[in-house]
Amino acid sequence: MRTTAVILSGPRDLGLQTIQLNEPAPGDIVVEITHSGISTGTEKLFYTGQMPPFPGMGYPLVPGYEAAGEVVEAAPDTGFRPGDRVFVPGSNCFAPTDAGPIRGLFGAATKRLVTPAHRAVRIDPALEAEGALLALAATARHALAGLNHVLPDLIVGHGTLGRLLARLTIAAGGEPPVVWETKAERRRHAEGYEVIDPATDQRRDYRSIYDASGDPKLIDSLVMRLAKGGEIVLAGFYTEPVAFTFVPAFMKEARLRIAAEWQPEDMVATRALIESGALSLANLITHTRPASEAAEAYATAFSDPDCLKMILDWRATA
């Protein structure tokens, strides 16, 4: 079985190639991908060559961990059947070539993939491109959920993650948070909350500040906005060291928490919120390109400040 996939052969060396898939094992399903998302966190690090080494890392690789598509092959014991609409967080299903392995890191940017059935999530057939956003929505939910976690009253950044954090806060019954955004064009599409220029905000009593900007240089300024005993949650992805001045944080008795990737229970809860209508995925995708233009799409996703979320459309790809 063959597929057309995005292959990142090295830093900034990206294009489409036809490659071989591993044959499905018992318990696997085969999914025809219609849409995949481009992450400006981990994928950008692979693309630029800045990803710190970890076991299993290497080029060439198939990037991506956000994909939506339809099941085309499934045994009855998998719980799926052909035609089911699913979200898949990628797969490592690519057969090695004579030159060596092709790594699935994380393997979602492909026309077709093979995955263990338990990794796929059945979604509403009405979710087209938005179906690829489930991982990001579940990541936002993971940052908010948990014992003793305080819902944000300030969110920094009105990108895709910031919007999801704000929407989920309201869906959880919290007060509408204040959202900071320095770019005027990104202050649009607020749904039930206020987005402001941080320069106009004089508050110094925020109990819980969620940073969704990924800017490691903001911590000191955020500490000054905390109430005593308040918390800063690092919900973004940081490519440079995060540091802060100790004395102001000491005076505020500030707490710092890092939110990582989603877990299965986050995905279950997020899907339920979407299906019930409590969480909207509208106005999050700003750019869509056919998969045949993958090289241009990745360059735009990582360089255009107006691009909140880029989606590759695989439907016309053979």
Swiss-Prot record:
Domain of life: Bacteria
Enzyme class per UniProt: oxidoreductase
Gene Ontology BP, a term: photosynthesis
Known EC number: 1.-.-.-
Record InterPro entries: ADH-like_N, BchC, GroES-like_sf, NAD(P)-bd_dom_sf
A molecular function (GO) term: bacteriochlorophyllide-a dehydrogenase activity
Pathway participation: Porphyrin-containing compound metabolism; bacteriochlorophyll biosynthesis (light-independent)
Keyword Oxidoreductase: yes
Pfam families: ADH_N (PF08240)
Coiled coil: none
Record CDD domains: 2-desacetyl-2-hydroxyethyl_bacteriochlorophyllide_like
This protein's UniProt keywords: Bacteriochlorophyll biosynthesis, Chlorophyll biosynthesis, Oxidoreductase, Photosynthesis
Function: This protein catalyzes the penultimate step in bacteriochlorophyll a biosynthesis.
NCBIfam families with a match to the protein in the record: bchC
Name recorded for this polypeptide: 2-desacetyl-2-hydroxyethyl bacteriochlorophyllide A dehydrogenase
Gene expressing this chain: bchC
